[in-house]
Swiss-Prot record:
Transmembrane segments: 11-31, 42-62, 78-98, 106-126, 132-152, 167-187, 206-226, 240-260, 276-296, 302-322, 330-350, 374-394, 396-416, 462-482
Alphabetically ordered keywords of this record: Membrane, NAD, NADP, Plastoquinone, Quinone, Thylakoid, Translocase, Transmembrane, Transmembrane helix, Transport
Broad class of enzyme this protein falls into: translocase
EC number(s) recorded for this UniProt protein: 7.1.1.-
A GO cellular component annotation in the UniProt record: plasma membrane-derived thylakoid membrane
Similarity section: Belongs to the complex I subunit 2 family.
UniProt membrane topology term: Multi-pass membrane protein
The protein, known as: NAD(P)H-quinone oxidoreductase subunit 2
Length: 527
């Protein structure tokens, strides 16, 4: 029996992964309401198993023909599948780091997992939405659940402040985006399907430009792109660390999925205009995010500005708009998931044991916790783009795609800001690995021994090991992952690329020859 067979003309099999997450959400809710304390301890495991089940259905869906469901409102094309997988993978690792965090903070358990699964569901639907109504509902589902999670530890004033700021700025950005969508609805004569809007608008003139700017403003908030980034540092610093981890990858991945589909489908006649606007935003985002990060003294706030800068790097692939550009965007988000969440897993463990995330308090950690030091150092160095880690190949593919497309300014700014980012990442690593006893911080001097048998600690350790291994080996196996991304781009009709195999740079044999301002990359033929 084919579980993805059409149901009437709805093709309901396209949303099987979302159905699995919904059933998991309902099960968690019921167990939390009617179960005892022993049953509630199983909620993290239930959530993880349900999310893994959703990943399995996404893998099965990859092997099925192109599906467009619910009368064209939702697409299960390969690009959608990869972005939905990113959101679900982020949720899995978030549960792993949240179990111990919630147990130690004393906050209600069930509510957090319900909110996390709701946000995951919103992000998954947003990744495949092809209708204005579904786009808005998905965006609000993800947004409202994220606001509530940001203020989850309501007894902490910083968490409440972060949630309020996130809510106010998020509501404003939603209103801007909704106004842009209303203009599109009017200009297209009442169409709600993205493709129908593009074909019905014709020459929209000034009104079309205004709609484009408003939509970019709403999407820019989700990407934390400058100048829509003001919420990021305060929300990252004040929110619970597992929530910050989810927002930094899951919410951002859903935002990029929306940006790729919305801009490529609705505004093909204004491609030059939106690429010009995003080019400026990408440059500002890379520069501000990486420069301001240098001055930060708290690791979560440093990673907030780092995530802004990382969004600027990913925007290069969006601006380029070629097969290699979109594929490098997807590939970078795949490796960003493991290296960024790996860093947050380490921050979670350290903050649970010391109660701080001040960078100076990490001084001398190598002497007390070599495993944590190794994981955090590898993840930070990968974020900086040092070879042979995953982050290096992610940036290499992005810059290669930009250079091939003639986006020389973007690539040069990306290279310079990457060097800047290496400085502040290495500064943290240097602080961690100092060997002089007199340089050890007070928090590290009083650092308790890790009890890996305590509630939530096994899951935290598994998450750290998984992200550490993935960060190392994703660099070595970068070419198969990039090939997967290329295939997804080619097989997604809304991007308009032929299905013929595009040239792919072999990571094992990329040769860089310094020739003037930048080297040229040679690509051997696929054998």
């Amino acid at each position: 029996m084919d579980v993805f067979a059409p149901t009437g003309n709805l093709y309901a099999g396209a949303i099987w992964p979302e159905v699995v997450v919904t059933l998991t959400l309902l099960l968690v809710l019921v167990v939390d309401l009617v179960g005892g304390s022993a049953a509630r301890k199983s909620l993290p495991a239930l959530s993880i198993f349900g999310l893994i089940g959703a990943l399995v259905t996404l893998v099965l869906q990859w092997q099925q023909p192109q599906l467009e469901s619910f009368l064209g409102s939702f697409a299960a094309d390969p690009v959608s599948i990869l972005f939905r997988g990113l959101v679900v993978g982020t949720a899995v690792l978030t549960v792993m780091m949240a179990e111990r965090y919630i147990a130690q903070s004393g906050a209600p358990t069930g509510e957090f997992y319900v909110l996390l699964l709701t946000a995951t569901l919103g992000g998954m639907f947003l990744s495949g939405a092809t209708d204005l109504i579904l786009v808005f509902v998905s965006l609000e589902t993800l947004g409202i659940a994220s606001y509530l999670m940001a203020g989850y530890t309501k007894r902490d004033p910083r968490s409440s402040e972060a949630a309020l700021k996130y809510l106010l700025i998020g509501a404003s950005s939603t209103a801007i985006f909704l106004y842009g969508m209303s203009l599109l609805y009017g200009l297209s004569g009442g169409q709600t399907k993205l493709e129908a809007i593009a074909s019905s608008m014709g020459d929209a003139g000034l009104a079309g430009i205004i709609a484009l700017v408003l939509c970019i403003g709403g999407i820019g908030f989700k990407l934390a792109a400058v100048p829509f980034h003001q919420w990021t540092p305060d929300v990252y610093e004040g929110s619970p660390t597992p929530v910050v981890a989810f927002l930094s990858v899951g919410s951002k991945a859903a935002g990029f999925a929306l940006a790729v589909r919305f801009l490529a489908t609705v505004f093909p006649a204004m491609t030059e205009e939106w690429r010009a606007v995003l080019s400026v935003l990408a440059i500002l985002t890379m520069v501000l995010g990486n420069v301001v990060a240098i001055a930060q003294t708290r690791l979560k706030r440093l990673l907030a500005y780092s995530s802004i800068g990382q969004a600027g790097f990913v925007m290069i692939g969006l601006v380029v708009g070629t097969e290699a550009g979109y594929a490098s965007l997807i590939f970078y988000l795949l490796v960003y998931l493991v290296m960024n969440l790996g860093a947050f897993l380490c921050i979670t463990l350290f903050s649970l044991k010391t109660g701080t995330d001040e960078i100076n308090e990490y001084s001398g950690l190598y002497q007390k916790d070599p495993f944590l030091t190794l994981c955090l150092s590898i993840c930070l160095l990968s974020l900086g783009g040092l070879p042979p880690l995953a982050g290096f190949f992610g940036k290499l593919y992005l810059f290669w795609a930009g250079w091939q497309a003639g986006a020389y300014t973007l690539v040069l700014v990306g290279l310079v800001t990457s060097v800047i980012s290496i400085y502040y990442y290495v500064r943290v690593v240097k602080t961690i690995v100092v060997k002089e006893p007199q340089e050890m911080s007070v928090s590290v001097q009083n650092y308790p021994e890790t009890n890996w048998q305590a509630e939530g600690m096994p899951a935290l350790r598994v998450g750290m090991v998984l992200t550490l291994v993935a960060t190392i080996f994703a660099g070595i196996l970068s070419n198969p992952l990039f090939t997967l991304s290329i295939q997804a781009v080619e097989q997604s009709p809304f991007l308009g690329f032929p299905t013929a195999q595009a040239p792919i740079p072999e990571s094992a044999s990329l040769q860089v020859a310094v020739d003037g301002s930048l080297g040229s990359l040679t690509q051997p033929s696929q054998g």
